[in-house]
């Protein structure tokens, strides 16, 4: 949770500053990307929410970010710890014509792109660990989860979920903060 301290005679304050995601600012920074970007305060899973929106008729492509996931997940059903306003939880959905053979190398491509993006902002040593993790100094900083919906031989949607540990709290169990998987 979020630590709040009582300041006698003044009220309350957060234990540390908090910067929330801003869809407008993110859209401005992604100039030239015509895809709708939505930020939610809390979802069970950004990938699961994208599938619900597809089922409700929202057309791909679009981007969904969340401040928190209550049931974040990784490959093979692993839990992805997703506390509020500490890390980045993002999913993107793309329509794929021609079936899943069109996206065979997508997980690798996304992993390399995440590692390169982290390096570009000064996170030295970010490297891809096959098939879907990005590590820094042997510690997992990012995970990628791809899921498909539709006809795997024809028209389908691929949902690309990316979680990046930005400000993982010290009270998160050490096995989650530092485990190399």
Where are these regions (language model features)?
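Active-site glycine-centered loops adjacent to acidic/histidine catalytic or metal-binding residues
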Residues: 72, 133, 163
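N-terminal lobe of the biotin/lipoate ligase/transferase fold
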Residues: 2-120
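Positions that flank functional sites
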Residues: 12, 133-134
């Amino acid at each position: 949770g979020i630590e709040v301290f009582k300041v006698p005679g003044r009220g309350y304050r957060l234990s540390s500053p908090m910067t929330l995601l801003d869809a407008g600012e993110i859209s401005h920074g992604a100039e030239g990307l015509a895809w709708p970007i939505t930020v939610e305060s809390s979802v069970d899973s950004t990938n699961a929410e994208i599938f619900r929106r597809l089922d409700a008729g929202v057309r791909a492509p679009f981007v969904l970010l969340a401040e928190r996931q209550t049931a974040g997940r990784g490959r093979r059903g692993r839990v992805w710890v997703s506390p509020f306003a500490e890390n980045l939880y993002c999913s993107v959905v793309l329509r794929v014509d021609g079936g899943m053979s069109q996206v065979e190398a997508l997980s690798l491509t996304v992993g390399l792109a995440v590692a390169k993006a982290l390096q570009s902002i000064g996170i030295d040593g970010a490297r891809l660990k096959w098939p879907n993790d990005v590590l820094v100094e042997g510690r997992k900083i990012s995970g990628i989860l791809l899921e498909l919906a539709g006809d795997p031989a024809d028209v389908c949607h691929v949902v690309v979920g990316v979680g990046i540990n930005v400000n993982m709290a010290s009270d998160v169990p050490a096995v989650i903060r530092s485990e190399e998987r």
